[in-house]
């Protein structure tokens, strides 16, 4: 069983990318579980046809400790198992703690069955606080992929996440598997992301072009592969799935200084 965490700044379409990636992997014969680790609880919406899934934390609040697995785990597109950890009540508590509670509960309830090929953690990535770093810190996820684009804040967040990976890689087995570019159609975007990934000592594992097919599929509460399986964008996600499944480049990243990051941005014309 490979356990992967997908990180990236808020709004970069991590959840969309993760769900479309898992749809590609399930077509390749893999059994998958997706654990949403974002308080928005939207990590499994496209796999469940838009059903708002009850989160682990909401279930615990309503039912107490005596929770059955089928009340927090739903089966979605092509048999993908879906869980949302959820978040605390606004203004109270720490969302990161919710991730810890949820993963521990899934382990206790036997969700991590031997037939699973992949478990994905879809994690809010702006804040690499202790709780959100939990899949890295506790050694749950061995592979990290960072979703980024050619925008400055996306790269700033990706560099910060790399610092978190570097910190925990020394004590655990976690490694960076690569950068996934979710294109924003920025000038020189491919070249910039490729240079950024290489500077970290990693790779740009796939460049996902911007496409209206993604929005159409989302409006219909489906992944692109389910909604329009023959379109070009569906093939992009299939290619991403193939590359992730066949990936053998796992590194401890070498995060860059703020000055070096800005230098790379200048070299590619993003800042003057």
From Swiss-Prot:
Record keywords, A-Z: 4Fe-4S, ADP-ribosylation, ATP-binding, Iron, Iron-sulfur, Metal-binding, Nitrogen fixation, Nucleotide-binding, Oxidoreductase
Residues annotated to bind ATP: 8-15
Reaction catalysed by this enzyme: N2 + 8 reduced [2Fe-2S]-[ferredoxin] + 16 ATP + 16 H2O = H2 + 8 oxidized [2Fe-2S]-[ferredoxin] + 2 NH4(+) + 16 ADP + 16 phosphate + 6 H(+)
MF terms in GO: 4 iron, 4 sulfur cluster binding; ATP binding; metal ion binding; nitrogenase activity
UniProt PTM comment: The reversible ADP-ribosylation of Arg-97 inactivates the nitrogenase reductase and regulates nitrogenase activity.
Entry-linked PROSITE patterns: NIFH_FRXC_1, NIFH_FRXC_2, NIFH_FRXC_3
Binding partners and assembly: Homodimer.
Function: The key enzymatic reactions in nitrogen fixation are catalyzed by the nitrogenase complex, which has 2 components: the iron protein and the molybdenum-iron protein.
Record's protein name: Nitrogenase iron protein 2
